[in-house]
Amino acid sequence: EILSGLVGSEMCIETEPYFLHQKELDPTYIGTTTVQKCVRTNDIDNIGDARHLSFFEMLGNFSFGRYFKKEMCAWAFEFSTEVLGLPKEKLYFTVFEDDDETIEIWKSLGVAEDHISKLGEEDNFWRAGPTGPCGPCSEIYFDQGPEVGCGKPDCKPGCDCDRFLEYWNCVFTQFDGQEDGTLAPLQTKNIDTGMGLELSLIHIS
């Protein structure tokens, strides 16, 4: 049994038993939060560009069936605009290509439709590995301005340039990936987020 780790690689292994309901959180709490020290291994070749560090701290919040998309999106938007003080016109959002529900939630919070992009499984469906808890995700980006971009008229989040910098990933962990590639619904719909501490500090400085 893994109780904790010194460092991770952008996944919180301690929460998996709770997503699978092998363990239960004290019902007094609606979720839990973490600060995780991470070392990049999955994209080590990208270290040194303007978007990737070899080491960073990831802030996370997790829910095991107590809240889901509507609450998470509202809190993420509120925290970004009211606590961090980021101007909402600088915020852009990506969603999984089949997730129209999350698009409507962002729009209901006042996000302009042209600030929301659909991306495919590679970008907006999060998996810890070939099997286990997984689900579509919605990422929040900060627009650093056209002066650091590629100059292309269709530049948007997901572009390889440095204009749009992702700082928060909200994962809607609702499936259990099987060895045959199928997705079995989990017992509850859950939340797993990761916010880059250093990237967030860049945006508010």
Task: Label each PLM-derived region with a short phrase.
Residues 1-7, 12, 202-203:
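Single conserved hydrophobic/aromatic residue that forms the stacking wall/gate
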Residues 8-13, 102-106:
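Charged, often glycine-rich, active-site loop that binds/positions anionic groups
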Residues 15-16, 171:
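RNA-binding basic/glycine-rich loop and surface signature characteristic of RAMP-family CRISPR effectors
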Residues 17-39:
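N-terminal structural subdomain of ketosynthase/condensing enzymes
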Residues 29-31, 45-48, 83-85:
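Short, charge-rich binding segments
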Residues 35-64, 182-184:
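Residues forming anionic-ligand binding surfaces in small-molecule and nucleic-acid pockets
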Residues 57-73, 79-201, 205:
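Active-site cavity-forming subdomains of large catalytic enzyme subunits
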